[in-house]
Structure formats: C-alpha cells, structure tokens
Curated annotation (Swiss-Prot):
GO terms for cellular component: nucleus. InterPro entries: mRNA_G-N7_MeTrfase_dom, mRNA_G-N7_MeTrfase_euk, RG7MT1, SAM-dependent_MTases_sf. It is an enzyme of class 2 (transferase). This is mRNA cap guanine-N(7) methyltransferase. SUPFAM superfamilies: S-adenosyl-L-methionine-dependent methyltransferases (SSF53335). The keyword Nucleus applies. Belongs to the class I-like SAM-binding methyltransferase superfamily. mRNA cap 0 methyltransferase family.
Length: 486
C-alpha cells in the first residue's frame, strides 16, 4: 500500500546513528531493556529495580610529605633570657608601686580636702561687732576687706558703664569659694547694680551661714556694706541670690541649674551668654594642689564667663614665697658650711668618744618657715633651692592666721605659670598688684580713700593707718588680680 507501512512487516532495527542520539536517561543507564512510559510519554520507573547510590570515597592525604610537628620537651624553659625575666619582674613591681602611690596620693588629697572643709565649717561666726572691737587682727580684717572692695569697685563694672547713671544694665556675679558670704555687702555696693549673685563653696556650714547673712540683708531692706562709688545713694534693691554646696575646683559646675540657665560655654570660642564677673577671694590657691584641679577651675571660670567678662580675686603672693624660700635655703647652706668648718676641731677637743648609750645623730634640716605673732607659713618638706617652683603644682605649705586659720594646708600659685595657664582658656591678664601696692595707689582715690575711713583702715581725723606693722606684713602675703575673657 503506497504511502504507508506494511502491518505484517517486522520492526526495523535501529542503526548506530539512532543509538548515539538516544537520551542519557535511556533504559541502558538503569539496566532494563525498555523503559515503560505513561500515556503522556513520561518515563516511569520500578523502584525495586533501582540501584543504590554509590558512596563517594575521599582521597587520602599523602603521608610523609609534611614534616612532623616538633613537640616541646616536658619541663623545657621558654627561650627567654634571665635578664628579660628580671626586667619583666621589675616592670611589674614598678607598676604596682606607682598604683600604690597613686592610691595613697588620692587618699591624702581627700584627707586634705576634708581637713580644709572641716576647718572652715568649724570657724565660728562671731559677728561684726566682735570683729570691729575685740578681734586681735581687726586692723588686718578691715584692710583686707577694703582691698576686696577696691577690686570689686574697679573691675566689676562693664567697660562702658557710666557711674551715676541709673537704669543701665545689671551684672551677673558668680562667687567661687564664697565662704560665709562675707562679700555680699560689697556686691550690694558695687558701682553697677547686681541682678543675680550665685555663691558656691564646698563647706556646707559656710553656705548655710551665707544664706543666713543674705536673709538678714533682705530683712534690712538691702542695706549692707559701707558704700563704694556713689556711696551716698540710698540702699539699692537687693539682688537675687542663690547658694550651692559645690567644689568648683574638683568638679564641673555645669550641672547646676542656675549655671546652665545663665549660660555655660565649654568650648574655647564660647562666650555669648554667661556671667559678667567671676570672683575668687582668698581661695584659688587650693586649686593648685594638682594640674587637674587647676585646669578644672579654669574650665569652670572660662565656661561661666561671657566674652568680655572679668575674673577677679586675691591669692598668696608667690614672689614673697619664692623670696622667703630662697633666703631660707641660703641660710641653710651658710649654716652647713660653718658647721663643716668648725666640726672637726670641736669633735677632737672633746677628749674621747661619746658616752655609752649616746648616739651622734645628724642635725635635722629645718624646713622653710617664716611669719610673726599674727601669721605663720611653714613648708613641711624640702623646697627648691632657687625658690622657683617646678612643676608649678602640689607645693604644699601650712598657713596659720590668728583667729581665722589654724594650720590649714595651702598650695603655692606660681604667678607666671598661672598667667600662662589662664591664656589657654582665653583669659588675658589686665591687672596684678600686691596688697601694699593697691593701698599706695588707691588710698587717695576720691571714693576709695573715704571708704578706707568708713571701714576703719585709717583714722578719719588724722589719716593715721589703723593697721599694725605685723598686720601689714601678713596683708602683703597676698596679691589682687583681674583677667578679661577674650
């Protein structure tokens, strides 16, 4: 039948070409002659006839190619020399020693802080009448108060302030180390009206007494102090005051609400807002216990001041201290020289050795000390031969002032080192005088001269100075200063 396959014809055998084109999943791969298919033409498998997958064998690593690991003989010592081990031990011991010394120093500093705080908390408040009549150092008290009034009168006003004109801007004052509030009356009589006064001190009892003094002034209608420039005016409106127990040298003051409200700029270029004046009278020397404290103090000052604000204060005179220390050391050198020259002959003429039980003990070298019946300065340890304190921190001495200070530890403030350090915080020196120089320059001022009479520094009729030579010597232990924030 043309065009079709004969039904009786046997199936054709496949040639080689057809075998090569057979798909890879043919029955030859699974060991069966033919692969059954379903109606759709898909392959079907008999699971029982499938062979399991062959397990893959890993190739073995060649043996003997890598060198065997060299084992350390038990008990063998590391390849470190005895000198290295000794140096390591010495470094460890040195670290331990430094850690002990640091801990001891921290403990001593805390003890000193506690001593100072306890001392000022314990000083009784005797009242103005006692200070004017019964105090043995009433002349010194009056003189120092007049000096502080001079500094406040001269440097608390803004540069563009015009005396005698009311209604001008008021100033904001931060008093670090305010103590019992002894300067509240002086600020009430400041040439430029004070709007806000913030007093801080680490001694809690002193802060309580400052609050009491402020309440007393408030009850008197703001009267306090003895007047200053324009002292003939009536009593001004009493300024607002806040008091806080705070160590302004050992910790930041920016956590105090009123400080943040006024404005605190911690950056070097701040100064848009802040206080007009920061005052530190007879207290800043405590900051020079360590460099860390001195810098913290200056950070607080610079952060609290606005640009153009003033830092005023009074501190011990480092020039006087250096001179006294140098003179003491020169005397000690001369004394040792004389002892050495006379020592051999005096011992040979004794005629024999020391008696049984006696010891020839070397003479203990005296530390630097000076003063009079009113005040005394004593260094507990060795001082620099040339009187120059290097480094400028941590030079402790004990200070005594009759009726006021009982052997309290204080610290030298080397003036040039302080001035240079202040420049790092944009504080530029404007004025620096000893108390004697201040008296000589301001005693005849048309305002400050009469103020000295009202404050009983000199006699109103005769002009005689009502301060003894001993009190003047004690007063000249101090200097006043003023810095501007630039």
């Amino acid at each position: 039948m043309a065009g079709g396959a004969d039904l009786d014809e046997p199936p054709r055998q496949s040639d080689s070409t057809t075998d090569r084109k057979r798909p890879a999943d043919s029955t030859h791969e699974i060991g069966s002659a033919d692969v059954p298919r379903d109606r759709a033409g898909n392959k079907t498998y008999d699971i029982s006839k499938l062979e399991p997958a062959r397990k893959r064998q890993r190739s073995k690593s060649p043996s003997g190619e890598a060198a065997p690991r060299k084992l350390k003989r038990p008990g063998a010592r590391a390849t470190i020399s005895e000198a290295d081990r000794k140096a390591a031990r010495e470094r460890a011991l040195e670290r331990e020693r430094l850690a002990r010394e640091a801990a001891t120093a921290d403990e001593e500093r805390q003890q000193i802080n506690d001593v100072v705080k306890a001392h000022y908390n314990a000083v009784p408040e005797r009242g103005r009448d006692w200070r004017k009549t019964d105090s043995r150092i009433k002349g010194l008290r009056s003189f120092n108060n007049w000096i502080k009034s001079c500094i406040i009168q001269k440097f608390s006003p803004d540069e563009d302030h015009q005396p005698g004109r009311g209604g001008g801007p008021s100033i904001l004052v931060l008093d670090m180390g305010c103590g019992k509030g002894g300067d509240l009356g002086k600020w009430q009589q400041a040439p430029q009206h004070v709007e806000l006064y913030v007093g801080m001190d680490p001694a809690d009892v002193s802060i309580d007494q400052a609050r009491d003094r402020y309440r007393s002034m408030s009850s008197r209608g703001g009267r306090g102090g003895r007047g200053g420039r324009g002292g003939g005016r009536g009593p001004a409106r009493l300024f607002e005051a806040r008091f806080h127990v705070k160590d302004c040298f050992g910790e930041p003051i920016s956590d105090i609400d009123i400080i943040r409200q006024v404005g605190f700029e911690s950056g070097p270029h701040g100064g848009g807002r802040g206080f007009d004046v920061v005052s530190m009278m007879f207290c800043m020397h405590y900051a020079f216990e360590t460099e860390q404290k001195a810098r913290q103090m200056l950070k607080n000052v610079a952060g609290a001041l606005r640009k153009g604000g003033r830092l005023i204060g009074a501190i011990p005179n480092s020039d006087v201290i250096s001179t006294k220390v140098r003179e003491h050391n020169e005397r000690m050198v001369e004394m040792k020289k004389k002892q050495a020259e006379a020592g051999d002959g005096s011992k040979k003429d004794d005629g024999g050795d020391a008696e049984e039980g006696e010891l020839d003990e070397p003479e203990v070298e005296k530390s630097a000390e000076w003063g009079n019946d009113i005040y005394r300065v004593r260094f507990p340890g060795k001082t620099p031969e040339d009187g120059i304190f290097r480094p400028p921190f941590g030079w402790k001495y004990n200070f005594f002032l009759h009726e006021a200070v009982e052997e309290v530890p204080e610290y030298v403030v080397p003036w040039e080192a302080f001035r240079a350090l202040a420049e790092d915080y944009n504080l530029e020196l404007q004025w620096h005088r000893s108390f004697k120089e201040i008296w000589d320059q301001e005693k005849d001022d048309r305002t400050l001269g009469p103020l000295s009479e009202r404050m009983h520094v000199r006699d109103r009729n005769t002009g005689e100075l009502l301060v003894s030579p001993e009190e003047l010597e004690a007063a000249n232990f101090y200097v006043g200063f003023c810095f501007y924030k630039v």
